Amino acid sequence: MNASNLLVELFVEELPPKALQKLGDAFAGVLFEQLKAQGLLASSEARLTAYASPRRLAAHITEVLPQAEDKAVSQKLMPVSVGLDADGKPTPALIKKLAALGAGEEAVAGLTRQGEGKAEALFHSSTVRGVMLADGVQKALDEAIAKLPIPKVMRYQLADGWSSVHFVRPAHGLVVLHGTEVLIGVKALGLTAGTATHGHRFEAAVDPVVIRSADDYAAQLREEGAVIASFAERRAEIARQLQAAAERLGGGVRPIEDEALLDEVTALVERPNVLVCEFEKEFLDVPQECLILTMKANQKYFPLLDAAGKLTHQFLVVSNISPQDASAVIGGNERVVRPRLADAKFFFDQDRKKTLASRVEGLGKVVYHNKLGTQGERVERVRSIAKSIARQLGDTGLAQQADLAAQLAKTDLVTDMVGEFPELQGTMGRYYALNDGLDVAVADAIEDHYKPRFAGDELPRGNAGVVVALADKLETLVGMFGIGNLPTGDRDPFALRRHALGVIRMLVEKDLALDLETLLVSVLPAFGDKIEDATPQLADFIYDRLAGNLREQGFSAQEVDSVLALRPQRLSDVQKRLEAVRAFGELPEAPALAAANKRVGNILKKADQAVQAQVDAAVLAEVAEKDLYAALQSVAPKAQQQFAAGDYTASLQTLAALRAPVDAFFEHVMVNAEDPALKANRLGLLATLHEAMNRVADLSRLAA
């Protein structure tokens, strides 16, 4: 059978722009996988191309067969003893089973036997006719539509009195072509497959666009319909035009980089045309973050930055039309953006009439959580925690700076600008703090206390920012855990996982001399009797986040488990411990010592009572135990010294010298001796060994 390429296009009204790419990939992907599962692809070389524009979802699939190949099927029926009587004739049960398969009694002669003895069974062989392409596409199309990731569907009628159709947007056309042939009878959403689609609403050369063949689809839409059907091609064209427009302006200007905005604009236009617009320079007195946000979020414009990263008074618009005279389009966009910028300027001017300090009282009217009080109460807790952290770091001056920053950190929440643009919280606080004449370190801390906001985000710039950011995140974590408001599954409305990672990153990357569990407990007094003490559960939660983060960095699960099993309190030490464990794992002595360490741990766990790491040299009897004791006396102090100095790699490598005496001990010494004094002394020797071996990590976790 000759294979041809297949095209399936669903023509619809404008799709949700933020979901377009996902919808396009899902639609095409399910079609491809369904056809593959039905055996309708001629080879493993078949390729899929997904198309997605504001008004269409389509898939082009190569090497599609007109009919799947027939299949020989062998089906087990029943044991021979059940299907045939003593004379070898078919039983009623066998006749009934064959009838269910559409076969008569004459099929008995063609049955085969497989197996031996009681396991011998009868098998019926038949040929299953391969599915026809039209039927296969119908099934695949139904599945693709059913599985589209649509958060909300519309209900509509194709004509008055017709039954309702449910889909993300009303559909108006269906094209299904196998080569040049329409697959007759394929239907979807009340539509029947044909060859006609539609191009650009205003600039198509012909309407409808009649697709000649599956392979002509993209080219015909571009030439006759003025549509770039491929999402990727359209995106690349927009990026190219944005860069070209900026270069024509000169002066080193460049469009702001925003991948999400580029994706959204790609989903809004079918044939992009980038135009240069501008606004009055007086608006540049407003913080550029405000102007950039309103242009991007509200208007989908691309602001232009100069070589120094400062906002210019020009911006780029991606239009869906390409008139000979674009002045009307440019003027319209400039008129639309002007009121937005004027609002931002008004908010900025009004907000600066009040100091941040005068807004603190207003936070008492903003509810934070019904069990944890208002933002005003929360601010007082963060202040208390920040001062406690600064004291633990031994810096009185830092405590004063952090206290002021913590007091004012949330005050921009009650400003007009942040009320309009919540994304600017912290950013506007910094601008208003500088306007009030506050120290730059305090202003930076106000902005930075939200950092890191996401994975890979930068950390606070100064020490005050780090202290307030830590205090803010710890207040959230301890408070939420204390009222039992824990993340479950995908639900994490208070971003506790992100806050935990933020705490980890600051403790590690800023190399803070703070013990984790001491730090968590120090937060509790700020809450009084509002919450339960859930710091043990919170510590587990943080260690779990740390473990996941370390595995993502490339450390093995065994390496991570070995270090975190000891629950090291200085998280800034964890990386060094892991590097030491990795270096130790490369030593030839490592496997034997890890296995021995595991054995020692098991022996000590099974001891009748708690074993102290004490050895009486006079009680030692066997040569092997004396040798191990002597080796420990020689090696352990040096390893302990290196550990105390933070040289974990050297400490573990020093301990590698214990391999031979440890092996000899287990080969020649009976730990559970009949003499109680001898047994206790040997257990004490093993406890001493265990203590020496497990300062950096629990090496037993490295055992195979």
From Swiss-Prot:
The keyword ATP-binding applies. PROSITE patterns: AA_TRNA_LIGASE_II_GLYAB (PS50861). It is found in: Cytoplasm. One of its GO terms (cellular component) is cytosol. The keyword Ligase applies. It catalyses: tRNA(Gly) + glycine + ATP = glycyl-tRNA(Gly) + AMP + diphosphate. It comes from the Bacteria. Pfam families: DALR_1, tRNA_synt_2f. One of its GO terms (biological process) is glycyl-tRNA aminoacylation. Its EC number is 6.1.1.14. Its main location: cytoplasm. SUPFAM superfamilies: HD-domain/PDEase-like. InterPro entries: DALR_anticod-bd, Gly-tRNA-synth_bsu, Gly-tRNA-synth_heterodimer. GO terms for molecular function: arginine-tRNA ligase activity; ATP binding; glycine-tRNA ligase activity. Keywords: Aminoacyl-tRNA synthetase, ATP-binding, Cytoplasm, Ligase, Nucleotide-binding, Protein biosynthesis. HAMAP family: Gly_tRNA_synth_beta. Tetramer of two alpha and two beta subunits. Belongs to the class-II aminoacyl-tRNA synthetase family. This is Glycine--tRNA ligase beta subunit. It comes from Delftia acidovorans (strain DSM 14801 / SPH-1).
